Amino acid sequence: MKISILAVGGKMPAWVQEGYAEYAKRLPREIEPRMVELALANRSKSYSVDAVKQAEGEQILGAYDNAPGHKRLICLDVLGKSLRTEMLAEKMAAWQMDGVNPCLVIGGPDGLSQSCLQRADEKWSLSGLTMPHPLVRVLLIEQLYRAWTILQNHPYHK
């Protein structure tokens, strides 16, 4: 199983890069998380939110279409399904058994396009709270690591 994280935006602060790297390196080779950073759409003074989301959505879906193997598109969205870490662990176990390579999508500051949300196999919400997107990267990779530790009966989750 290869996990792809498709994230709109680049040039993250050092603490984000360090936090992400810390948890990514803890995951075993067979999970092999891959961060794909996609450019923010141009936001001029008179930009249209829908046009920006559409441009970013095209990049996201293009990256998804180029991801390897049998895939699932999972969009992170405030209106998505809330998961407990144990449920995420169950999903990871199923992905491994079924040979699925999940693509987890973190949208830009304006959210995800309707085309992304409509094409998603699943929509998840990490929290009912609004979070800065850099923090979501660290939170997501930590939760993937935590779910993996549950599957391994590792004491990290306790």
From Swiss-Prot:
Gene Ontology CC annotation, any one: cytoplasm
Top-rank EC class of the record's enzyme: transferase
Pfam families tied to this protein: SPOUT_MTase
Enzyme nomenclature, EC number: 2.1.1.177
Main location: cytoplasm
GO molecular function, one term: rRNA (pseudouridine-N3-)-methyltransferase activity
Catalytic activity: pseudouridine(1915) in 23S rRNA + S-adenosyl-L-methionine = N(3)-methylpseudouridine(1915) in 23S rRNA + S-adenosyl-L-homocysteine + H(+)
Subcellular location as annotated: Cytoplasm
Record has rRNA-binding as a keyword: no
Keywords annotated in UniProt: Cytoplasm, Methyltransferase, rRNA processing, S-adenosyl-L-methionine, Transferase
Record has Cytoplasm as a keyword: yes
Residues at which S-adenosyl-L-methionine binds: L76, G107, L126, S127, G128, L129, T130, M131
Listed InterPro entries: Alpha/beta_knot_MTases, RlmH-like, tRNA_m1G_MTases_N
Self-association state and partner proteins as the record states: Homodimer.
NCBIfam families, A to Z: PRK00103.1-4, tRNA_RlmH_YbeA
Family per similarity comment: Belongs to the RNA methyltransferase RlmH family.
UniProt function note: Specifically methylates the pseudouridine at position 1915 (m3Psi1915) in 23S rRNA.
Protein's UniProt name: Ribosomal RNA large subunit methyltransferase H
Organism annotation: Teredinibacter turnerae (strain ATCC 39867 / T7901)
Lineage: Bacteria, Pseudomonadati, Pseudomonadota, Gammaproteobacteria, Cellvibrionales
